[in-house]
Amino acid sequence: MDVNPTLLFLKVPAQNAISTTFPYTGDPPYSHGTGTGYTMDTVNRTHQYSEKGKWTTNTETGAPQLNPIDGPLPEDNEPSGYAQTDCVLEAMAFLEESHPGIFENSCLETMEVIQQTRVDKLTQGRQTYDWTLNRNQPAATALANTIEVFRSNGLTANESGRLIDFLKDVIESMDKEEMEITTHFQRKRRVRDNMTKKMVTQRTIGKKKQRLNKRIYLIRALTLNTMTKDAERGKLKRRAIATPGMQIRGFVYFVETLARSICENLEQSGLPVGGNEKKAKLANVVRKMMTNSQDTELSFTITGDNTKWNENQNPRIFLAMITYITRNQPEWFRNVLSIAPIMFSNKMARLGKGYMFKSKSMKLRTQIPAEMLTSIDLKYFNESTRKKIEKIRPLLIDGTVSLSPGMMMGMFNMLSTVLGVSILNLGQKKYTKTTYWWDGLQSSDDFALIVNAPNHEGIQAGVDRFYRTCKLVGINMSKKKSYTNRTGTFEFTSFFYRYGFVANFSMELPSFGVSGINESDDMSIGVTVIKNNMINNDLGPATAQMALQLFIKDYRYTYRCHRGDTQIQTRRSFELKKLWEQTRSKAGLLISDGGPNLYNIRNLHIPEVCLKWELMDEDYQGRLCNPLNPFVSHKEIESVNNAVVMPAHGPAKSMEYDAVATTHSWIPKRNRSILNTSQRGILEDQQMYQKCCNLFEKFFPSSSYRRPVGISSMVEAMVSRARIDARIDFESGRIKKEEFAEIMKICSTIEELRRQK
């Protein structure tokens, strides 16, 4: 029979129908090829927004730099970066006046953090520009390489293990006349194979020393590498994002710590909290505006959009903010915090890999590296690329571009939020001194503005004043993309508000399903996603039960583990049937071994192994939880793992799930082809670094809770720990005298070797 779809919505309030408008099925778009073009776009746009500024030349690097600050006053309707320092400082002063002591307290908190942060903080994060190799690396490797180079150049403050001491080395390194680095390279030789007598190419990996003079080192230290942002939906064009190097990262971390502490105490800030906590915070602001507006007043909300937020921000403005926020603090603290914005005022952007050229016949392909863009004849390029390159040429130095204005994506989210909130704060009646007033929410570049006034003219005047006040600090509200509704309906950071925040469950749809890590993790992540959506996103019990059944079905098809008594034939069904038949307690078999599903919406919080443990045959338990199983390269057993889940919109979220390591927690082996390339040396370094860290954790099992503090090296710490443990074990009779003597001997040998080295 035909069903009229409108009947479905008869009893549903309009706001609950939002989940039916979900446009994002299928995979998001990914970028291919180089990001060079996108980076050039960013650089050219950024300079265009600030074009009336003053040009100067950096005395150290020779880079031309554009400074739009305190230049011409901004104009209506045109996005620009012409912020005025005195306006920013005044906004800061008013923010402090409305929140007495907020800056002071945040400074004290940050000082404490600075004293305690270890350098391994910088190993968090993914890709990082590694200045020693001039390309991207995992954060831990990039840090290890930087420290290694620092030490070989006589910079040793970092050995204390404190981040602040590593940063002292960074500052010192910038004064050095030259820095010596080790680079990996690859030699190819044609040799005759003894067995087959054919000529083969033999590759060897070499390391060579290279000296960088002060200018080249400074350029590298100030470089941000660029990549294309992947998986962005709803955009026609891709855009570039930046990965800073190790010299910048530590300083940025401390600035963001300070700004985060301030944001935590600003009711209009949507950062650093998230999820339900964020919704509660935002609902408060709306409630306040609704309650404080008199019955005669009108209240409107703007769902705001800013034009090119970070391309119009300016590091010099951030420097002014920090100078003001820390004005009564000790000199060292002010210096540490002002370095990040100063480095950003002098930053260089790497153009990435360059351009690919193909001949008409498609036989030949060649890559034009970014370094060649200064000298290459432009007749090879199409019209639009030619324009880009012509614009960018004056700014090019060795394949990097001088980019003084602008911030690049995602660098100072917290601090820029403080700037945004400081303008929202000026909407109080005591500052507007008229009949209209405003308040709102700010989260990085996203904002919602609530304006109250006695009549429509007042609302318009309020919005205009807000718009122009923003202009003075380099924030450009987009008149085209912002829209106004009666207060009670707006959108902010993908949360839709209609008399309360609406659960938009469809946003979470992409995270349902099988992740493809391994059988154990996938089962755990799948049920955790359903559980979390029941808690946070109004996923009802009936729908959750259905989601669970669909997930189990999906899981069984993915891993071909249909129940042992099924008729479905797959590659695995022969083995699974055999297991089914010889198992006494069939309910104890995991789903991935062809067992039945015991999950329902009441027990989603229990890992499957625990759920079925009492039901398992003894020999099955022994096989399942056997750390010595030779076929499984085991993960370290941690009680909680983190999965990255992708909502349809917005950033990837980290989600915790319980992990019980079994013989199903396998890790796929690495692709071998990397071993024949020049990356191999890098890979070996990475593995060695990993091994050292793992060994260290073995000696200090609690090191995940409290790192050993002190100046001693990792080796010394492990040796002294081994001696203490051995003595305790010997005195309590756990080990024999001979074993004790042997351990002591090994410890002495290690120390002896260290002395000789």
From Swiss-Prot:
It is found in: Host nucleus; Host cytoplasm. InterPro entries: RNA-dir_pol_NSvirus, RNA_pol_PB1_influenza. Gene3D superfamilies: 6.10.140.720. A motif (Nuclear localization signal) lies at residues 187-195, 203-216. Keywords: Eukaryotic host gene expression shutoff by virus, Eukaryotic host transcription shutoff by virus, Host cytoplasm, Host gene expression shutoff by virus, Host nucleus, Host-virus interaction, Inhibition of host RNA polymerase II by virus, Nucleotide-binding, Nucleotidyltransferase, Phosphoprotein, RNA-directed RNA polymerase, Transferase, Viral RNA replication, Viral transcription. It catalyses: RNA(n) + a ribonucleoside 5'-triphosphate = RNA(n+1) + diphosphate. Its main location: host cell. Its EC number is 2.7.7.48. Pfam families: Flu_PB1 (PF00602). Disulfide bonds: none annotated. It is an enzyme of class 2 (transferase). Phosphorylated by host PRKCA. Residues 249-256 are annotated as: Promoter-binding site. Coiled coil: none annotated. Residues 50-82 are annotated as: Disordered. PROSITE patterns: RDRP_SSRNA_NEG_SEG (PS50525). GO terms for biological process: DNA-templated transcription; symbiont-mediated suppression of host gene expression; symbiont-mediated suppression of host mRNA transcription via inhibition of RNA polymerase II activity; viral RNA genome replication; viral transcription. RNA-dependent RNA polymerase which is responsible for replication and transcription of virus RNA segments. The transcription of viral mRNAs occurs by a unique mechanism called cap-snatching. 5' methylated caps of cellular mRNAs are cleaved after 10-13 nucleotides by PA. In turn, these short capped RNAs are used as primers by PB1 for transcription of viral mRNAs. During virus replication, PB1 initiates RNA synthesis and copy vRNA into complementary RNA (cRNA) which in turn serves as a template for the production of more vRNAs. Belongs to the influenza viruses polymerase PB1 family. Influenza RNA polymerase is composed of three subunits: PB1, PB2 and PA. Interacts (via N-terminus) with PA (via C-terminus). Interacts (via C-terminus) with PB2 (via N-terminus); this interaction is essential for transcription initiation. This is RNA-directed RNA polymerase catalytic subunit. The lineage of its organism: Viruses, Riboviria, Orthornavirae, Negarnaviricota, Polyploviricotina.
